[in-house]
Amino acid sequence: RGARGETEGRWSREAPGAWACGVERGGCQHECKGSAGASNCLCPADAALQADGRSCGLPAEHPCHQLCEHFCHLHGLGNYTCICEAGYQLAADQHRCEDVDDCAQLPSPCPQRCVNTEGGFQCHCDTGYELVDGECVDPVDPCFDNNCEYQCQPVGRSEHKCICAEGFAPVPGAPHKCQMFCNQTSCPADCDPHYPTICRCPEGYIIDEGSTCTDINECDTNICPGQCHNLPGTYECICGPDSALSGQIGIDCDPTQVNEERGTPEDYGGSGEPPVSPTPGATARPSPAPAGPLHSGVLVGISIASLSLVVALLALLCHLRKKQGASRGELEYKCGVPAKELMLQQVKTERTPQKL
């Protein structure tokens, strides 16, 4: 029994090694070989006997990892398959990997032009199209839905800038808007095409000869107590050596008036210096008192204003006389048209004999 017990213990699955080969093949997974009263389990050449002495398993370093170019997939006892990376296919020898010409596939993986690369491919679009999310689409117009007041001009593939018509320039701080601009002594006026007599000029200019804008020479009005330089659409005043603001550029050289009009030195950050006048076309110009020769356009404006005042006074006089109950003939003579004057003369001629 003891021997049998030992034999039974030796045959148990807990005991390592093979049993007698005549009993269920010694418990070996692959092959059992007995010699000189001892039994041993054998495994295939590409497998190794495991710790229990009966099972067969893959060795730690399987030779397929050196045989396959990319990857080795083990399945079953001693079996393997070589696998290639994406973009490659297994060669005829079942071990090497060859590049796949993706562009030769049908349908083509690209919407327009396909360029095959090692292990992959690249999609390109025809001239005038852009590749967006794998699709070739018309490029987005940089000027689409712009807010330019006059005209939009593309800059590159995605930017744009607003341009203005001749005689206009972008407004500083609002480049989508345009304002009249003249950097010369005279420029064409901006006239209404339906009403050619209605024209406008840039700031610092005046209508002259109907459709021409002429620069106003502010220096002729003695507005600058120092050295005055007339500029297109504006002017600059350089204070003289007898001024507390000597050498500074502004619109007034009296420090008292400068401080009253522009604020205290604290308003300038404690420097005590008045700000430099802005660039031409943006100068805040005070209303100069006419002290020099007037321009022809100014004289025309004064004449029109005077004539309008006379007409208004005559109309007021007529209205007052009507309220006072003046005779119709006298009022019509003063305020009526020439046709009514002839009728009044006939009436007066007829009334004279009646009075006699």
Swiss-Prot record:
Residues exposed to the Cytoplasmic side: 321-356
GO MF terms held by the record: calcium ion binding; transmembrane signaling receptor activity
Keywords: Blood coagulation, Disulfide bond, EGF-like domain, Glycoprotein, Hemostasis, Membrane, Proteoglycan, Receptor, Repeat, Transmembrane, Transmembrane helix
Region (Disordered): 255-290
Coiled coil: none
SMART domains associated with the record: EGF, EGF_CA
UniProt membrane topology term: Single-pass type I membrane protein
Residue spans crossing the bilayer: 297-320
Biological process according to GO: blood coagulation
Function of the molecule: Endothelial cell receptor that plays a critical role in regulating several physiological processes including hemostasis, coagulation, fibrinolysis, inflammation, and angiogenesis. Acts as a cofactor for thrombin activation of protein C/PROC on the surface of vascular endothelial cells leading to initiation of the activated protein C anticoagulant pathway. Also accelerates the activation of the plasma carboxypeptidase B2/CPB2, which catalyzes removal of C-terminal basic amino acids from its substrates including kinins or anaphylatoxins leading to fibrinolysis inhibition.
Listed name of the protein: Thrombomodulin
